[in-house]
From Swiss-Prot:
This is Glucose-1-phosphate adenylyltransferase small subunit 2, chloroplastic. This protein plays a role in synthesis of starch. It catalyzes the synthesis of the activated glycosyl donor, ADP-glucose from Glc-1-P and ATP. It catalyses: alpha-D-glucose 1-phosphate + ATP + H(+) = ADP-alpha-D-glucose + diphosphate. Leaves and seeds. Belongs to the bacterial/plant glucose-1-phosphate adenylyltransferase family. Residues 1-63 form a transit peptide. It comes from the Eukaryota.
């Protein structure tokens, strides 16, 4: 777990929830080298109601928060009846250069974690232990992380749990790579079909949020839906940037509109009290946007991708709207917690610095009822020598000497030298330590060791892993440049945020 600024850990808003707020079914989750393991005991609240015919009303819980404040009882339980499918995303061009050498879900997050840890942890905390991750681009680091972070046996029903990476591949039947989200799932339907489950849970690998998928699945079953789409309430200012949905009085989706404006936007207003918002919040948030998260009944998925839409490539723009037009029951499920699509450099930067927010961060890694799991690294505690650190999160194994750090996230194994000033910055840290002898040798030859050099000043920046920042460097973008590509010089500027490339060298005295 990361340390918080001035070594004071703020309490999570949901950390006060006790184990009594947890759910039904004792389960054991075992992680590699016993990094995070233990039993969670849950109390039954009654059997899930199932009906033989169509239920005329959607049974959707009130707006979902970060903590598990209600109980569920799936029958059969999620570990036996649900298969998690996490989509690794495309090439991640909007996140470049962070995706230059890694897949988007493998991008570091919050000092100690990676983006993929979010959906995997949400699955494990929701008793979903059979998980596939579909990837296509730069998947080596993602494969390595998942194999080290999650044991081959994750418990679950009959100890059959797993987290397995499926890379895009060519075959005699299909010589093409993944063409989109639906096509990626279609190409591996032969494998998914072998699992004796009721539903497929389709997730994105680049979202930051905490969600109880068991409640999501329960709403799907109780409404007798073919497909259930997770929906986020929106105000008018944000709504134009999303794909919006319109629902009827039963919460059934009847219309889709991508990035609507003007009169088209007004036409997409819905009564969000139907999905559980109170009257005041429903007035503030009269739109609902798709989160790109779906529960799809197994037989429906097979029918849609093989028979109804064999050429469709995308769930959001083709398969889901097509299912609605065919008259299938496509329901909306409201999620009203924190959610961020980490699709751009600016969104990624803001999401990371959001965890330093006072008094309660946008997203808390300190929620003991729903922990975020990751790879065990067995690093020593961070060492801070005469450092002035405020409103910051410090990862494991850092060495910080006589410097100032404010409103920043400092990743694992970071080395920050005397006199440095770090403000509003995300340091991703390093993959390895350099020995003292290595650093002395580099200094003697005029080289630059990994980390931040003496008297350097960094503000509003992202410093990727293993970067070498020399002495007296200024990365402050004093000219307020919004966009610049300086790959040969080791950095990019996007939305005014300077991003130093992984393994880059910024010589002493450089001003950016």
């Amino acid at each position: 777990m990361a340390a918080i600024g001035v070594l004071k850990v703020p309490p999570s808003s949901s950390s006060s929830s006790s184990s009594s707020s947890s759910k039904a079914i004792a389960r054991n989750l075992s992680f590699t080298s016993s990094h995070l393991s233990g039993d969670k005991i849950f109390t039954l609240s009654g059997r899930t109601r199932r009906t033989s015919g169509r239920n005329p009303f959607i049974v959707s819980p009130k707006a979902v928060s970060d903590s598990k404040n209600s109980q569920t009882c799936l029958d059969p339980d999620a570990s036996r009846s649900v298969l998690g499918i996490i989509l690794g995303g495309g090439a991640g061009t909007r996140l470049y250069p962070l995706t230059k050498k890694r897949a988007k879900p493998a991008v570091p997050l919050g000092a100690n974690y990676r983006l993929i840890d979010i959906p995997v942890s949400n699955c494990l905390n929701s008793n979903i232990s059979k998980i596939y991750v579909l990837t296509q681009f730069n998947s080596a680091s993602l494969n390595r992380h998942l194999s080290r972070a999650y044991a081959s046996n994750l418990g679950g029903y009959k100890n059959e749990g797993f987290v397995e990476v499926l890379a895009a591949q060519q075959s005699p039947e299909n010589p093409n790579w993944f063409q989109g989200t639906a096509d990626a799932v279609r190409q591996y339907l032969w494998l998914f079909e072998e699992h004796n489950v009721l539903e497929y849970l389709v997730l994105a690998g680049d979202h930051l949020y905490r969600m109880d998928y068991e409640r999501f699945i329960q709403a799907h079953r109780e409404s007798d839906a073919d497909i259930t789409v997770a929906a986020l309430p929106m105000d008018e200012a944000r709504a134009t940037a999303f794909g919006l949905m319109k629902i009827d009085e039963e919460g059934r989706i009847i219309e889709f509109s991508e990035n609507p404006k003007g009169e088209q936007l007004k036409a997409m207003k819905v009564d969000t009290t139907i999905l559980g918002l109170d009257d005041d919040r429903a007035k503030e948030m009269p739109y609902i946007a798709s989160m790109g998260i779906y529960v799809v009944s197994k037989h429906v998925m097979l029918d849609l991708l093989r028979d109804k839409f064999p050429g469709a490539n995308d769930f959001g723009s083709e398969v889901i709207p097509g299912a609605t037009e065919l008259g299938m029951r496509v329901q909306a499920y409201l999620y009203d917690g924190y959610w961020e699509d980490i699709g751009t450099i600016e969104a990624f930067y803001n999401a990371n610095l959001g965890i330093t927010k006072k008094p309660v961060p946008d997203f808390s890694f300190y929620d003991r009822s729903s922990p975020i799991y990751t790879q065990p690294r067995y690093l020593p505690p961070s060492k801070m020598l005469d450092a002035d650190i405020t409103d910051s999160v410090i990862g494991e194994g850092c060495v910080i000497k006589n410097c100032k750090i404010h409103h920043s996230v400092v990743g694992l194994r970071s080395c920050i030298s005397e006199g440095a000033i770090i403000e509003d910055t995300l340091l991703m840290g390093a993959d390895y330590y350099e020995t003292d002898a290595d650093r002395r040798f580099l200094a003697a030859k005029g080289g630059v060791p990994i980390g931040i050099g003496k008297n350097s000043h960094i503000r509003r920046a992202i410093i990727d892993k293993n970067a070498r920042i020399g002495d007296d460097v200024k990365i402050i973008n004093s000219d307020n440049v919004q966009e610049a590509a300086r790959e040969t010089e080791g950095y990019f500027i996007k939305s005014g945020i300077v991003t130093v490339i992984k393994d880059a060298l910024i010589p002493s005295g450089t001003v950016i």
